[in-house]
Amino acid sequence: MADNFNFELVSPERLLLSEMVTEVVVPATEGEMTVMANHAPTMTTIKPGVVSVRSASGKKQDYVVFGGFADILPTGCTLLAESAVPVEELHKDELTRRIEAARKELEHAELHEHKSRLEHFIMELTHLRGIVQQD
């Protein structure tokens, strides 16, 4: 049986989750990471994607995050998201709205680095839209 550790998922709007868990899968910018108790101390940036949380009771919960960073310690993990919602609360039309807003910003972007980041963000949101279920 896996050891438990404290996990918090925080966005500017609210604290989405604070509980003991056995496993958290985060969409780190360098690749998907599975965090468990006694993980080596790590800080990583988070890209838009799905965070999967397995609670101490065995229940699995998924959340959509739109970037941020995670602070991982042997005793816990805190994920500070730019924006986050439970996956069942997010609809494809919201993702489409975010994609269109990023495309409009891309039209007016002048710096190559800014354009490149926006193009990558649009690609990540488009992929995310493909995995979020429509009600």
UniProtKB/Swiss-Prot annotation:
Transmembrane segments: none annotated. GO terms for molecular function: ATP binding; proton-transporting ATP synthase activity, rotational mechanism. It holds the Pfam family ATP-synt_DE_N. Keywords: ATP synthesis, Cell inner membrane, Cell membrane, CF(1), Hydrogen ion transport, Ion transport, Membrane, Transport. GO terms for cellular component: plasma membrane; proton-transporting ATP synthase complex. It is a peripheral membrane protein. It is found in: Cell inner membrane. CDD domains: F1-ATPase_delta (cd12152). InterPro entries: ATP_synth_F1_dsu/esu (IPR001469), ATP_synth_F1_dsu/esu_N (IPR020546), ATPsynth_dsu/esu_N (IPR036771). Belongs to the ATPase epsilon chain family. Produces ATP from ADP in the presence of a proton gradient across the membrane. HAMAP family: ATP_synth_epsil_bac. F-type ATPases have 2 components, CF(1) - the catalytic core - and CF(0) - the membrane proton channel. CF(1) has five subunits: alpha(3), beta(3), gamma(1), delta(1), epsilon(1). CF(0) has three main subunits: a, b and c. This is ATP synthase epsilon chain. It comes from Rhizobium etli (strain ATCC 51251 / DSM 11541 / JCM 21823 / NBRC 15573 / CFN 42).
